[in-house]
């Protein structure tokens, strides 16, 4: 394979920039930059870099990782330079004379091809890079440690063990008894049940990775946009005394106790003849259905006239807020028609902490295990596991052992696709194409 190079740190001015070279000719970097110091593997060495005219480009730290003891499994040279745009450009220009620029995720792809990581760990790397909150990072780090790989390899090995027994029965049919068939059926049912339980996770790993959606819902002028802006800590939504100001769905990302929360502002729900407002209301109702949690807003002045359409939105995913509660001193829950409301006044900054705490409790009840237990984190993983389950479901012991064995092989292959024991170009492009250049 060609020797590749790329800037690993973000482009722009910084204290330090890191440029990585990987491949069988990576050590040619030393000769090209006229490095006279002896470079030892896994030792940081301070040295100047020279261009062809023997002019100093920069004084850098060089770290050399000899194959196979590197991230990619190849010889790797890292140049830790000053984060000057001019210096970075000059070094990349020099490297371009002897090596090939790396594509997105190409270093990680080589790590996979050299058995340094499986596909689930590779996906975890990009998830960690993209993590914006503590819980997202914890989930990615757990997956990077191999929790998913070990789980899937365990199921794969169990299927292979069953397959081995079946192959023996095919070779020695006189050994096949009713109890032997029952035992195989029992083992396959246990594996299938484990896989199905893994699938029936409410997509929590994927939701945590992408963000937990919380929709703010209520009548027009119930304070939805005001609360939305307050939680976002900036003016995103237009706030007006006129009802129906918000027509479209707005989103902002916030961090609550380490969880990635996507707060959604929606149009006020009411009867309207305005076609544009009607579309906004339709979208608000769709968000009410698809959101992970809901904040239901009721203005204090309307506490004695609850809107049935709003009440119908309240369920166990809801947090009810009595908005515009400027004159209320208590921070205790207020019960209205057997529904507990949190009194909140954004303008007086009252009840906000109580609301955030309520959101945190709802989220933790559903997602606290995502950072400690192996959950599915991508649609790619889910598809292959579902395929494996479907194959196992369709196995009939009325068929010849040879056909059952073939179905087992297909199920094993689906699990192998998850971790990358077998793969194709489309799968690899799907995984590594999401990486940035330099990783």
From Swiss-Prot:
Pfam families: MMR_HSR1 (PF01926), MnmE_helical (PF12631), TrmE_N (PF10396). Signal peptide: none annotated. Binds 1 potassium ion per subunit. Keywords: Cytoplasm, GTP-binding, Hydrolase, Magnesium, Metal-binding, Nucleotide-binding, Potassium, tRNA processing. The keyword Metal-binding applies. CDD domains: trmE (cd04164), TrmE_N (cd14858). Mg(2+) binds at residues 225, 246. Its EC number is 3.6.-.-. Disulfide bonds: none annotated. It is found in: Cytoplasm. One of its GO terms (cellular component) is cytoplasm. (6S)-5-formyl-5,6,7,8-tetrahydrofolate binds at residues 20, 78, 116, 439. GTP binds at residues 221-226, 240-246, 265-268. Transmembrane segments: none annotated. Residues 211-364 form the TrmE-type G domain. Its cofactor is K(+). GO terms for biological process: tRNA methylation; tRNA wobble uridine modification. PANTHER family: TRNA MODIFICATION GTPASE GTPBP3, TRNA MODIFICATION GTPASE GTPBP3, MITOCHONDRIAL. Belongs to the TRAFAC class TrmE-Era-EngA-EngB-Septin-like GTPase superfamily. TrmE GTPase family. This is tRNA modification GTPase MnmE. It comes from Ehrlichia ruminantium (strain Welgevonden). The gene is mnmE.
């Amino acid at each position: 394979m060609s020797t590749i190079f790329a800037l690993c740190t973000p482009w722009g001015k910084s204290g330090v920039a890191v440029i990585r070279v990987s491949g069988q000719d990576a050590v040619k970097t030393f000769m090209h930059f006229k490095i006279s110091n002896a470079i030892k593997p896994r030792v940081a060495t301070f040295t100047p870099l020279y261009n062809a005219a023997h002019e100093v480009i920069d004084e850098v730290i060089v770290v050399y990782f000899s194959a196979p003891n590197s991230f990619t499994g190849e010889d790797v040279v890292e140049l830790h330079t000053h984060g000057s745009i001019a210096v970075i450009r000059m070094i990349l220009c020099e490297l371009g004379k002897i090596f090939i620029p790396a594509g997105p995720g190409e270093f990680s792809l080589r790590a996979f091809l050299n058995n340094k990581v499986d596909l689930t760990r590779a996906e975890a790397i990009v998830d960690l890079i993209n993590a914006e909150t503590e819980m997202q990072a914890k989930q990615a780090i757990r997956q990077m440690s191999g929790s998913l790989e070990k789980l899937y390899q365990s199921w794969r090995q169990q299927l292979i063990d069953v397959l081995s027994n079946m192959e023996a029965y095919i070779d020695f049919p006189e050994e096949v008894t009713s109890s032997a068939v029952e035992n195989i059926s029992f083992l396959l049912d246990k594996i299938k049940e484990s896989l199905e339980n893994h699938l029936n996770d409410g997509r929590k790993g994927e939701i945590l990775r992408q963000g937990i959606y919380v929709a703010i819902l209520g009548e027009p002028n119930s304070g939805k946009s005001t609360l939305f802006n307050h939680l976002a800590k900036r003016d995103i939504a237009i706030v007006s005394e006129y009802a129906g100001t918000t027509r479209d769905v707005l989103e902002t990302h916030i961090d609550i106790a380490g969880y990635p929360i996507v707060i959604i502002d929606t149009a006020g729900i009411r009867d309207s003849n305005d076609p544009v407002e009607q579309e906004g209301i339709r979208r608000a109702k769709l968000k009410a259905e698809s959101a992970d949690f809901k904040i239901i807003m009721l203005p204090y002045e309307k506490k004695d006239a609850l809107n049935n359409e709003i009440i119908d939105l309240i369920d166990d995913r809801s947090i009810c807020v009595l908005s515009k509660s400027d004159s209320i001193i208590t921070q205790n829950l207020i019960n209205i028609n057997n529904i507990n409301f949190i009194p909140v006044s954004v303008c007086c900054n009252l009840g906000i902490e109580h609301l955030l705490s309520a959101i945190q409790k709802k989220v933790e009840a559903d997602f606290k295990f995502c950072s400690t237990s192996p959950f599915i984190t991508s649609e790619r993983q889910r598809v292959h596991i579902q395929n494996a389950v479907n194959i196992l479901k369709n196995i009939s012991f009325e068929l010849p052992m040879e056909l059952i064995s073939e179905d087992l092989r297909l199920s094993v292959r689906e699990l192998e696709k998850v971790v990358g024991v077998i793969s194709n170009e489309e799968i690899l492009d799907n995984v590594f194409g999401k990486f940035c250049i330099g990783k």
